[in-house]
Amino acid sequence: MSATSESFTAFVARAMRSPDPVARLRERIADARLDADERERLRAIDEDGFRVAALLVAKLRFERLMQGSPLVARGFAIDARAFADVFREYHEQVPMTSPMPWEEGKTFENWARRQANA
C-alpha cells in the first residue's frame, strides 16, 4: 500500500464513482505522497478509457438498481430528471458492495431513508 494509505483498487473504485473520474486520476498522480510504482501504474491508465469505464460502471449500477427496487423504478418513471440527480449523489457517496440487483435496491432505499432523516 502506498503512503496515501488507500489501495490502488480502492482508489480506482472511488474515482469511478466521482463526477469527474479523470480529474480524480490526475489529482492522485500529482499527490506527492504517492510512491513511484503506483504513480507509474496510474499514469499507464488511458484517460479516455477510464472515463468510458466509469460511465459503464454507472450505467450498470443504474440498471441493477432499476431491476432491484420497484420503488426506485416507479420514482424514475415519475420524474426521470429528478431521479437522475438523486442517483448521481447516491453513486458518488455509496460504494458498490454487491452485483445483485435486490441488494443494490436495498442499499439505495436505506441510503434514501438516511438522507430523508438528515
Which role does the model predict for each range below?
Residues 1-118:
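Long, compositionally biased intrinsically disordered regulatory segments in eukaryotic proteins
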